[in-house]
Each structure stands twice: as structure tokens, then as C-alpha cells.
């Protein structure tokens, strides 16, 4: 059986430097 895939939580966009 495949382990349950847990997607990573959405991250805030990186500021344009």
C-alpha cells in the first residue's frame, strides 16, 4: 500500500527583490 500523500501547506509568495 502506498503511504497517504500529504501535500505541503501553501507558502506565501516571495517578495521580488
UniProtKB/Swiss-Prot annotation:
It is found in: Secreted. It comes from the Eukaryota. Coiled coil: none annotated. GO terms for cellular component: extracellular space. Keywords: Antibiotic, Antimicrobial, Immunity, Innate immunity, Secreted. Its main location: secreted. GO terms for biological process: defense response to Gram-negative bacterium; innate immune response. Induction: By bacterial infection. Antimicrobial peptide active against many Gram-negative enterobacterial and plant-associated bacterial species. Not active against other bacterial species like H.pylori, P.mirabilis, B.pertussis or N.gonorrhoeae. Belongs to the apidaecin family. This is Apidaecin A.
